[in-house]
UniProtKB/Swiss-Prot annotation:
Organism from which the protein derives: Arabidopsis thaliana
Tissue: Ubiquitous.
Protein name: BTB/POZ and MATH domain-containing protein 6
Location of the protein in the cell: Nucleus; Cytoplasm
Family from the record: Belongs to the Tdpoz family.
One Gene Ontology biological process: response to osmotic stress
The BTB domain, residue ranges: 205-271
Subunit-level organization: Heterodimer with BPM1. Interacts with RAP2-4. Interacts with CUL3A. Binds to MYB56 at the promoter of FLOWERING LOCUS T (FT).
Role this protein plays: May act as a substrate-specific adapter of an E3 ubiquitin-protein ligase complex (CUL3-RBX1-BTB) which mediates the ubiquitination and subsequent proteasomal degradation of target proteins.
Amino acid sequence: MSKLMTRTSGSSSPNTIPDQIESPTSSRSVTQTTNGSHQFVIQGYSLAKGIGVGKHIASDNFSVGGYQWTIFVYPDGKNPEDNSSYVSVFIVLASECTEVRALFELSLVDQSGKGKHKVHSHFNRSLDGGPYTLKYRGSMWGYKRFFRRSLLETSDYLKDDCLKINCTVGVVVSEMHCPRLLSIHVPDSELGSHFGKLLDTLQGSDVTFDVAGEKFQAHKLVLAARSQFFRSMFYNTLAENNSDVVISDLEPKVFKALLHFMYKDSLPGDVEPLTAHSFDLLRPSEIDDTLIVKLLAAAEMYNLSRLRLLCESHICKGISISSVSKILALSDKYNASELKSVSLKFTAENLAAVLQTKAYEDLKDDCPNLQSELLKAVAGYDDTSSSGGGKSQSVWAQLSNGGETSSRRVRQRTT
């Protein structure tokens, strides 16, 4: 903490202004860490063994402190000279940057329930040299001799051929606090809640919608402010005085959800989750009949881009190996570009497994136009994840025959 005090002085003559002391000021530099954690599960450890010394399996990227990170696990060790009998584990900086200072923790999870995890940590202990500094993308911190392989394979850390590694990153950040002598707290905006009350009370409503015989009241100004469609409906010369509107292309429950969004800028609470299990159970026609998908279609119909994104984000949570082909077909049908992009990326990263699913066979028959988009996504993924090349040579054959290939992909990357 640094403090500055200034003093002005003058003559002690009775005719001069007395000495004045300005109020002291202060500032405070606070250095702390922004922490985040990621769990990396390696399912099929026995299949990952034998990939070779210096070759690793990588986790998905995760974000902490504004930087991207990933975990590298070397089942056969990182270097042949001194640690080929060990499993090596490293945390890797995946962002382009100049310099990052951070603390790290790597934990091998005890899966027996005894809580005897193997922990290597910078946190809560004195560091002679301070936090670790990573200076460029690809810089890493970790242990070449993280665990002796022979001991690991007979330990409680390996269960059902599965390893779980927890990683915590603490990015060091510094802030300067200069408190003001006077301040007034301004609460968060209540605009959204006030508009929501308009919908709940219907006070001042000036338009009534008839949706399949069910009546809904609303406010023209609110709807016009939120949607170009309704702005044109209410404020062109032909329809300005029309206070009774028939909606023939939506069901009442969908229109009610649409109004909820228009007033409250969120999805209603009764929108059912579409989990991976839900997609497995439902046929495409049944998926189309869910409220969230009908709301997605309404967003496209009424050109509500934010509602479309909310629906896409909601559906995205159900992406899995078994469901991604159905979600790809859905995104193509309803012009959900963000959902399609995420689905294509997921498929590219898990290609071999997705090609074996029944849903992918249906996708080939129902949406043949997606084949070329999927090929581009897979080729792009291989370009970024492999330095050796040649991976995409048989991709088109795999996509065409539904995945009849002897290759197996465990999401390995070769350094």
